[in-house]
A protein has these predicted regions:
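N-terminal Rossmann-like or analogous alpha/beta NTP/dinucleotide-binding catalytic cores
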Residues: 1-22
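Phosphate/ribose-recognition catalytic cores of enzymes acting on nucleotide-derived substrates
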Residues: 73-179
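Glycine-rich, Lys/Arg-enriched anion-binding loops that position phosphate/diphosphate groups
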Residues: 17-116
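Short, histidine-centered active-site or binding-site loop motifs used for metal coordination
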Residues: 1-2, 30, 150-152
């Protein structure tokens, strides 16, 4: 069911003709089903955009991952008692899951991730911030791969910083329970 190009007018035969002309091969694989449902890139995109991480993981056969370089942020997480690794994506076109709070892993290290806007702070743009549990190493400028394990909650605006901090710690506890 593969289509590409304008109006998805390209098909397998088109790709095979292009391959012959340009010197590459095309292997057609049968459809892939999980639990009786067809797995496609469109289905994976819909699941991620809906925040259905566990279903996406099941369909992919592995956790969805986000890769990026750890950059300096504004230090707000550290000031609030929960330092974060701020990610600059390797691929600016990477499909990201629904904005929210997620339980994640980075290699063997467990953590919690905020992905999206920061409505509690006026003028604060969207970010991808990962707090790693029981981890205190300098990883600035390192590239890390964050495996998204589970959805915790959506983005919320808090009336006070204390309310935000309480939610951050509750999110951390929930992520630890999940992981």
């Amino acid at each position: 069911d593969h289509g590409f190009g304008k109006g998805r007018s390209g098909d397998v035969e088109t790709l095979q003709r292009i391959g012959t002309k340009l010197g590459f091969g095309v292997d057609v694989v049968p459809p892939y089903d999980v639990d009786g449902e067809h797995v496609s890139s469109s289905r994976i995109r819909r699941l991620l955009e809906a925040g259905s991480i566990e279903e996406a993981t099941h369909a992919l056969g592995r956790p969805y991952s986000i890769r990026g370089r750890v950059a300096k942020g504004d230090g707000r997480g550290r000031q609030l008692g929960m330092p974060t690794a701020n990610l600059e994506l390797d691929d600016p076109h990477k499909l990201l899951p629904l904005p929210g709070i997620y339980a994640v892993t980075v290699g063997p290290v467990k953590g919690v991730m905020h992905l999206g806007p920061r409505p509690t702070f006026v003028g604060a743009g969207p970010t991808i911030e990962v707090h790693l549990f029981d981890f205190d190493q300098d990883i600035y400028h390192h590239t890390i791969t964050v495996e998204v394990q589970a959805w915790i909650r959506g983005i919320e605006k808090f009336d006070t910083v204390d309310g935000l901090v309480a939610a951050m710690y509750a999110d951390g506890r929930k992520a630890r329970e999940i992981l």
